């Protein structure tokens, strides 16, 4: 699994949660 991509997805998810 690509770590970088995983971190990018995680960061996007956290931002999405913050907005809600």
From Swiss-Prot:
GO molecular function: metal ion binding; metallopeptidase activity; tripeptide aminopeptidase activity
EC number from the UniProt entry: 3.4.11.4
Entry's pH dependence statement: Optimum pH is 7.5-8.
Keyword tags: Aminopeptidase, Cobalt, Hydrolase, Metal-binding, Metalloprotease, Protease, Zinc
Gene name per UniProt: pepT
Name of the featured protein: Peptidase T
Localization in the cell: Cell envelope
Free-text comment on the cofactor: Binds 2 Zn(2+) or Co(2+) ions per subunit.
Organism: Fusobacterium nucleatum subsp. polymorphum
């Amino acid at each position: 699994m690509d770590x970088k991509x995983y971190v990018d997805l995680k960061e996007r998810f956290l931002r999405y949660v913050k907005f809600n």
